[in-house]
Amino acid sequence: MAVDMFIKIGDVKGESKDKTHAEEIDVLAWSWGMSQSGSMHMGGGGGAGKVNVQDLSFTKYIDKSTPNLMMACSSGKHYPQAKLTIRKAGGENQVEYLIITLKEVLVSSVSTGGSGGEDRLTENVTLNFAQVQVDYQPQKADGAKDGGPVKYGWNIRQNVQA
């Protein structure tokens, strides 16, 4: 399944030409996760620890957002919000089925590189954040929405549900 992916980070402008996501950053790939430090290997109860939330990482083409992201990483600038949006590509009724909203965002790394055989240079960017909200929209076989979104939210700083 082909998908369209975009990220909007504060006032940083990208080069997306998409009608709905104009001037956002086109995302080629992304990853994010979390782990729990609890242990079920010994003792009688098996306790849970504090969740370890990873930085969100994404790959993009080098574009006009690049110098701004580099400056934000260098200076430690914080953005109030970043939003990663993913939808199925093509068709008339494109449903944005996964939206990840980050709050209190810091650009934690920018890694640029390439080789002579590539058409366009790419870079990897990682974002650190204090709070996350995930909205997943189930879809029917025909692509229509199937009910409302399923949500997850966590305040990382306070280690509580958001």
From Swiss-Prot:
Compartment(s): Secreted
Induction conditions: Transcriptionally repressed by RetS and activated by LadS.
Molecular functions per Gene Ontology: identical protein binding
Keyword field: Secreted
Domain of life: Bacteria
Family per record: Belongs to the hcp1 family.
Family annotation (PANTHER family): CYTOPLASMIC PROTEIN-RELATED, PROTEIN HCP1
Protein name: Protein hcp1
UniProt gene name: hcp1
